[in-house]
Amino acid sequence: MGVERIQAAFENGKKAFIPYVMGGDGGLEILKERIRFLDEAGASIVEIGIPFSDPVADGPTIQRAGKRALDSGVTVKGIFQALIEARKEVQIPFVLMTYLNPVLAFGKERFIENCMEAGVDGIIVPDLPYEEQDIIAPLLREANIALIPLVTVTSPIERIKKITSESEGFVYAVTVAGVTGVRQNFKDEIHSYLEKVKSHTHLPVVAGFGISTKEHVEEMVTICDGVVVGSKVIELLENEKREEICEFIQATKQKEEA
């Protein structure tokens, strides 16, 4: 399915709620169970993090989750195996969030073959500059897996247009300067930034980094096509507050109907 499965998540004006889970945090059985739960709860896409020892874009919550996964001996191969098994039970799109180093260490051809086998539909590589994306972009295109671009508040318009014109899946619009993590509120300029990104791409635009309340979700999906919620989802899963994740999903769907 690949790119088409991601596109379907945004069809007919659907607003996407994209939770992030760290692969192997709590074990690989837990990863499969969390994917099943998020699918049943109505999430649009699930973003799965590949743990890495130097996660430069991650805030403290995601860093701790990655460290727990690495400390428990979780491997990239193990995560792929868990995704292969999860894919037999769910049709929700899988998007991997991985730094470039684990891809190259695993072998980029082998990594993408494993993605295909596991039914991965898209990949986000936060430390891969646009100018260097040919390291993996042609292989991903051949495999029908979306290389999802990140744009930031400081990205000039021309750069946004260039990055998004060659991309597939959706555009990940980073809503804060700095790392991921829970924020209390967003500055007014974020609204004009998201509108600017939307006006310069044919792809759905998803807001991410720092989204941690239902109010944030409601605010963001009035402007763009969906949200990624990472640190907050990890906290809620860790504290067994799953009903709050369902409330986030409901907040997204309500805006869809508005």
UniProtKB/Swiss-Prot annotation:
It is an enzyme of class 4 (lyase). Tetramer of two alpha and two beta chains. Its EC number is 4.2.1.20. SUPFAM superfamilies: Ribulose-phoshate binding barrel (SSF51366). Gene3D superfamilies: Aldolase class I (3.20.20.70). It comes from the Bacteria. One of its GO terms (molecular function) is tryptophan synthase activity. Belongs to the TrpA family. InterPro entries: Aldolase_TIM (IPR013785), RibuloseP-bd_barrel (IPR011060), Trp_synthase_alpha_AS (IPR018204), Trp_synthase_suA (IPR002028). GO terms for cellular component: cytosol. Pathway: Amino-acid biosynthesis; L-tryptophan biosynthesis; L-tryptophan from chorismate: step 5/5. The keyword Amino-acid biosynthesis applies. This is Tryptophan synthase alpha chain. The active site is at 47 (proton acceptor), 58 (proton acceptor). Coiled coil: none annotated. It catalyses: (1S,2R)-1-C-(indol-3-yl)glycerol 3-phosphate + L-serine = D-glyceraldehyde 3-phosphate + L-tryptophan + H2O. Keywords: Amino-acid biosynthesis, Aromatic amino acid biosynthesis, Lyase, Tryptophan biosynthesis. The alpha subunit is responsible for the aldol cleavage of indoleglycerol phosphate to indole and glyceraldehyde 3-phosphate.
